[in-house]
């Protein structure tokens, strides 16, 4: 994208791609975030006063129970995200190795694993930022990829690093995203997002002056503003305080409640255990195990299940 900034509020855009909103979160208790209010519900955000404080509490959004998503008619493309043997190599190094998974519309799905296991590379491929070496993915049956503008236009991407313009304020980032994606009622919606993420006191501060946690939350607000059908959140909780983690989880559950596919990569297994409907345990670019957090954890924790899976795989390789 070619962007020139002639001064605050004076932005000249010569492309239709904004990485931070591409056309483009540890929780101690097993809380179901879907039971909280949804700040992004159209009735609660679009009609919310700009001030964002002292606003009436929005009505709760009912979300289906885990795994309770109805099957799609066989004559129509399956709703949701589907990856088939997605692979990415860099020279002789394979970072993502034949990744295959599905995520239904209305689900929060976690990619869980340690640093360097291929989560960010997968997110970049799904966001249309990085081309796959081989394999495919679809969103609601439509092929995705670097040149798939229709899928990219429905995708909100929270990258692991970068994506913000240091000289632009939080509000100017939202305005740029709204203009690129023709978001209706974006001012009320944007003000609500900033308030929900405790950024309303920094609305007109430049992003270059933000802390890392504030930058992560601003990236989330940008990605959520257009109401994407696919939300990609790459390590969104990194550097974010507990209140911010809770707010991000509530927003992600709200997006899923409205039918979006939400894919979250994280190494914080406690968060994933509370937030996700399905989780995929990833090592060296491949899925080792997948299922609901409860099924994988059994009588223990998800962290314990991950260690058991790793140990079993290591013993099998000897």
What role is predicted for each listed range?
Residues 175, 179-202:
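Conserved ABC ATPase "signature" region
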Residues 127:
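Helix-to-loop junction immediately C-terminal to a conserved catalytic motif
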Residues 231-235:
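Catalytic Walker B motif of ABC-type/P-loop ATPase nucleotide-binding domains
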């Amino acid at each position: 994208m070619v962007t020139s900034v002639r001064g605050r509020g004076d932005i000249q855009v010569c492309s239709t791609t904004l990485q931070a909103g591409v056309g483009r979160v540890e929780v101690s208790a097993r809380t179901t975030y879907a039971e909280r209010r949804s700040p992004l519900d159209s009735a609660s955000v679009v009609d919310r006063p700009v001030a964002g404080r002292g606003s009436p509490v929005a009505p709760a959004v009912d979300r289906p129970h885990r795994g309770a998503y109805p099957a799609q008619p066989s004559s129509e493309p399956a709703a949701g995200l589907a990856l088939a043997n997605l692979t990415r190599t860099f020279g002789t190094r394979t970072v993502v190795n034949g990744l295959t998974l599905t995520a239904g519309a209305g689900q929060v799905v976690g990619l869980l694993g340690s640093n360097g296991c291929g989560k960010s590379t997968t997110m970049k491929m799904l966001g249309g930022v990085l081309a796959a070496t081989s394999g495919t993915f679809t969103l609601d049956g439509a092929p995705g990829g670097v040149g798939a503008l229709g899928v990219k236009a429905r995708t909100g991407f929270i990258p692991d690093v970068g994506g913000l313009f240091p000289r632009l304020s939080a509000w100017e980032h939202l305005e740029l995203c709204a203009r690129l994606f023709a978001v209706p009622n974006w001012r009320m919606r944007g003000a609500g997002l900033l308030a929900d993420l405790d950024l309303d006191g920094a609305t007109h501060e430049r992003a270059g002056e933000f802390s890392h946690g504030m930058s992560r939350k601003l990236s989330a607000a940008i990605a959520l503003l257009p109401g994407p059908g696919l939300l990609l959140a790459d390590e969104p909780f990194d550097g974010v305080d507990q209140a911010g983690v809770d707010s991000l989880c509530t927003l992600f559950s709200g997006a899923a409640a409205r039918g979006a596919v939400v894919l979250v990569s994280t190494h914080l297994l406690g968060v994933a255990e509370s937030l996700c409907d399905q989780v995929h345990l990833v090592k060296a670019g491949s899925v080792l195990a997948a299922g609901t957090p409860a099924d994988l954890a059994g009588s223990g924790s998800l962290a314990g299940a991950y260690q058991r899976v790793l140990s079993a795989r290591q013993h099998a390789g000897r």
